[in-house]
């Protein structure tokens, strides 16, 4: 909220809430200037913060400013929004510079219709303890649906100052028949309950009482459930009379009432209620009479429940059944799409039978047309057929065509009669008996060509899970797009693919077409003519060190931060080769030869065995791709080019269970080694470009070498065009610089 809103003091009581404030500023005895605390208190007295609720989600700050500025000078307005989606939460805060303006806005603008919804205005209460006390809060039920917030406020305003008034509404804005009135004092609430409870409002008798928090209501409700006296009986024979019904339950205790529900004609509806005096008698009746046969019917006898309690119990049962079903089919139900139109349930079952026992196989069909529409079309078509037959009879043509079958989409006409057949939607589901069979089917059948079309096979997911994943994917793409826009400000290089454990790459300003270097590698000591910032740990920059824009990137093994040294086999072979290559790359004309000093975690004997640093201009060419004659370092022998030991593969079961961000990382690890074989110099850039595609297409690229090569060639053409454009811009800028030098 704004500074004015933050400086607004909490409303302590009703007098302050309505702007009637007491001047507590006592003049200082000395002539000293007022302290900052005194000035802040004076500022608080001249400001007012209002809470504006029940707002439409489309209401903006500008709309509220236009409304509230008509009262007085507005200091600030803020519509509260969700931190992630930025959608309005339906309420806002309006801050005035004076409490008089706030009081005037509360009186004149309360319940003003904004975007078709009446707003609700009250003083902002910052202390949550005071907001949640509930003192003076009144609950009203059995309200007529014509009573709105304004009418309820006008009705109860006669008994005291109202802080807030609200009628509960559904999604469509219709009254739910109950509401709340929050008074400034408990005395006003008691006065309203005394005079209005049991009175008629719009010809309906209303109940008015103190609002009881839900927690207290639930505790009382549980106590009532434990000491019930009213029981519900169903499956009663229609011939049972009230006397027979009463005699059956009087055997177990004294009852106050026993009745069978009947319709308007007096016929039994098959259920009734019995109310006992004591809870013990009701409990005995439930235990002894439940599931017994009475007049040929097995009775159900149980505690009587209210409607909301039954609905809650049914909801819990449904949720439990849903969770049980979800756990039952977890990992065994497969989703298959890209099916041909002629594939039915039997063909789908035959496709997946070799992988295990199938409990169900279903191809989803399009919904059949409504019967009334079908009947109309059939009648119209019959009329058209009759006209055609009459014309053909007149022309003397044969009627052999009437018996032929003509197919048009999902409509089949046979001898003038039309039948609506469901057409395949192109996807279906197959459920196996155990997860191992399902995993095997996904591995073998995904991307397999069936009748010229590659199948997509994956574990089935619920709609809400897919929706959440889609939202996460969209959010990740938006973040990626923002990162790319930021990178374009520093040279516009496409995003690099970062292997596991590496830090993001940083592009120096003006380094067009060059490979980036890892940012923030600790330990580099800057010297005269120092090498790239963030160099190898402990390495000192020499006079002849290469500039930062020519330094090749340092690829670190997976799971290892830059500047650290790997354990195990990397220490002896692969990492030594990486260290030696870095030594050679950092050599300058004036650099010293010899081993690298002070590398932590490595014996000096191993370091000394490497070649000394020789002078030279190592680096990558600045024009785009690394030329064959360049001094860039080739891939290290013995170290996997994919950035991890062995060739990475894609496990479909693991991939489908991973988060969207992890799925992209796994697919990138699988594609990077293959792209590196085709284009070693630009493998990272190309992988980053391809990862913007959908996961289904990326999975296809991991299995189809020709498709991957085509995508790589396409990416290379885009990159070459980008480099040419950058070089053209540089050539255009060069003559201007030369002309400036000539003038100088």
From Swiss-Prot:
UniProt KW NADP keyword: no
PROSITE patterns named in the record: PABC, RRM
Cystines in this chain: none
Pfam families: MLLE, RRM_1
One function term, GO molecular function aspect: poly(U) RNA binding
Residue ranges constituting the RRM domain according to the UniProt record: 48-126, 136-213, 229-306, 332-462
Record field: compositional bias (Basic and acidic residues): 376-397
Polar residues biased stretches: 1-11
SMART domains: PolyA, RRM, RRM_1
Bias-annotated ranges (Low complexity): 33-42
SUPFAM superfamilies: PABC (PABP) domain, RNA-binding domain, RBD
Residue ranges, compositional bias (Gly residues): 527-545, 609-632, 640-649
Subcellular location: Cytoplasm; Nucleus
Superkingdom classification of source: Eukaryota
Region of interest called Disordered, as start-end residue ranges on this chain: 1-42, 368-411, 527-550, 607-651, 723-744
Span of domain PABC: 647-724
PANTHER family: RNA BINDING PROTEIN
Family: Belongs to the polyadenylate-binding protein type-1 family.
Protein name, entry field: Polyadenylate-binding protein, cytoplasmic and nuclear
Organism of provenance: Phaeosphaeria nodorum (strain SN15 / ATCC MYA-4574 / FGSC 10173)
Lineage: Eukaryota, Fungi, Dikarya, Ascomycota, Pezizomycotina
Gene of this entry: PAB1
